[in-house]
Amino acid sequence: MTEKPVALIVLAAGQGSRMQSDLPKVLHRLGGVPLVGHALSTGRTLEPEAVVVVAGHGAEAVAKAVAKLNPEAKIALQEQQLGTGHAVSQALPQLEGFEGRVIVLYGDTPFIGQETLASLAAHPADVVVLGFEASDPGRYGRLVTGPEGLERIVEYKDADEATRAIRLVNSGVLAADAALLREFLPMIGNRNAAGEYYLTDIPELARAAGHRVEVVTCDEAETLGINTRAELAAAEAAFQVRARARALEDGVTMTDPATVWFALDTCIGRDAVIGQNVVFGPGVTVESGAEILPFCHLEGCHVSAGATVGPFARLRPGAELGGDVHVGNFVEIKNSVLDEGAKVGHLTYLGDAHVGEATNIGAGTVTCNYDGVSKHRTEIGAHAFIGSDTMLVAPVRVGARAMTGSGSVITEDVPDDALALGRAKQVVKPGLATRLMQALRQKKGN
């Protein structure tokens, strides 16, 4: 926590025309979540008193996504995109009564780090601009500093040669006291080529009024913004490199790190082992000592210590694997809990199910959980044995230590310790196969 209370404003109103997409730019996915989710996730580390997301293009879709990412975040609507200063002014009414530090972030700039945000929040200056030393300053606005801090921000088109030689440039991210923003935002003009109101005018206005204005710097990589599909692909590659490095540093073994793909919130314990070509979607936790074998896809699931998954397995949202559970190849599990020591070896679908401790699920077992309208649950007790190719037609319960015969279709509850058979009686016709084949060949010959 910082000494001053903190509020976040995340600007997410732009259309992103260079993305060539009907989807709002901030909803394109990076690390398995919408771009705007990265700013919200990092900002959460400051424990902000309020979060406001400014939406414009595709506002309804943005609001829906934000509600899932941070249910406490508020939405401010910027109906006309008239610049960053105008966007922040639309958010301020949502911060009525807030007195503290406001940090303005961008929904399309996903890599601003926790330490950088903490520096912006804790800095004693009245206004703090986030800058970076650019390898190629290009057309960035230059930050002109002096003994008393930031003197001015000079846009490239307005800069002389000496100013253009400055490599310290503006990221666009800004932190300022809420009272100062309320005072100076109405003073911003739009006398520029675009006719827009720019947040970058705030430092100059504040300095002219005697306020302290400073610069905090970060690594250039943190400021990577995304405006095109190519930049999105580059950002995904950069995100994965960082995520893999972090996992290795945390004690995770990966047999081929370059083939493992992480989501923003992937959490893997030390001494877990991850095989090649594993994909983690959002919402996955893997405890210490678990093993994910090659070619698995996991999303919205929990894998306990000692469990093994794969190869070629899929864990979907709501899958909960207890300790020492084994999930083998070509198994799909959704919204199901497998208690400690349960085994599902191969070729199985478990949906909306609870599998008890040390139960064995035979190959080809399917929980028939959907009747075309509603989902239904399957309950399987501890130490049960489900024979291969069993169809469990939910809602149904198989008791503890019970068994089902291979090929059974189970439509009624099976008591504890019982054996259930639900298949037609086998009939053997001696010699019929030979006679039938002879007749068929004769018919074909005619």
UniProtKB/Swiss-Prot annotation:
Residues annotated as region N-acetyltransferase?
251-446
Q: Where is this region: Pyrophosphorylase?
A: 1-229
Region named Linker:
230-250
Signal peptide span: none
KW Cell wall biogenesis/degradation (keyword) present: yes
Q: Name one GO molecular function term.
A: glucosamine-1-phosphate N-acetyltransferase activity
Described purpose of this protein according to its UniProt entry: Catalyzes the last two sequential reactions in the de novo biosynthetic pathway for UDP-N-acetylglucosamine (UDP-GlcNAc). The C-terminal domain catalyzes the transfer of acetyl group from acetyl coenzyme A to glucosamine-1-phosphate (GlcN-1-P) to produce N-acetylglucosamine-1-phosphate (GlcNAc-1-P), which is converted into UDP-GlcNAc by the transfer of uridine 5-monophosphate (from uridine 5-triphosphate), a reaction catalyzed by the N-terminal domain.
Entry-linked PROSITE patterns: HEXAPEP_TRANSFERASES
Q: Which Gene3D superfamilies match?
A: Hexapeptide repeat proteins, Spore Coat Polysaccharide Biosynthesis Protein SpsA, Chain A
Q: Primary place of residence?
A: cytoplasm
Q: What is its EC number?
A: 2.7.7.23, 2.3.1.157
Spell out the GO cellular component terms annotated for this protein, sorted alphabetically and separated by semicolons: cytoplasm; membrane
Name listed for the protein in its UniProt record: Bifunctional protein GlmU
UniProt similarity note: In the N-terminal section; belongs to the N-acetylglucosamine-1-phosphate uridyltransferase family.
Per UniProt, subcellular location reads as: Cytoplasm
Annotated binding of acetyl-CoA, by residue: A363, N369, Y370, S388, S406, R423
EC supergroup of this enzyme: transferase
Q: Where does Mg(2+) bind?
A: D108, N227
Q: Keywords on this record?
A: Acyltransferase, Cell shape, Cell wall biogenesis/degradation, Cytoplasm, Magnesium, Metal-binding, Multifunctional enzyme, Nucleotidyltransferase, Peptidoglycan synthesis, Repeat, Transferase
Chain positions recorded as UDP-N-acetyl-alpha-D-glucosamine binding sites: 11-14, 25, 78, 83-84, 106-108, 141, 155, 170, 227, 316, 334, 349, 360
**Reaction catalyzed:** alpha-D-glucosamine 1-phosphate + acetyl-CoA = N-acetyl-alpha-D-glucosamine 1-phosphate + CoA + H(+); N-acetyl-alpha-D-glucosamine 1-phosphate + UTP + H(+) = UDP-N-acetyl-alpha-D-glucosamine + diphosphate
- Entry's cofactor comment: Binds 1 Mg(2+) ion per subunit.
Organism, per UniProt?
Paracoccus denitrificans (strain Pd 1222)
Gene Ontology biological-process annotations: cell morphogenesis; cell wall organization; lipid A biosynthetic process; peptidoglycan biosynthetic process; regulation of cell shape; UDP-N-acetylglucosamine biosynthetic process
Instruction: Enumerate the active-site residues.
Output: H346
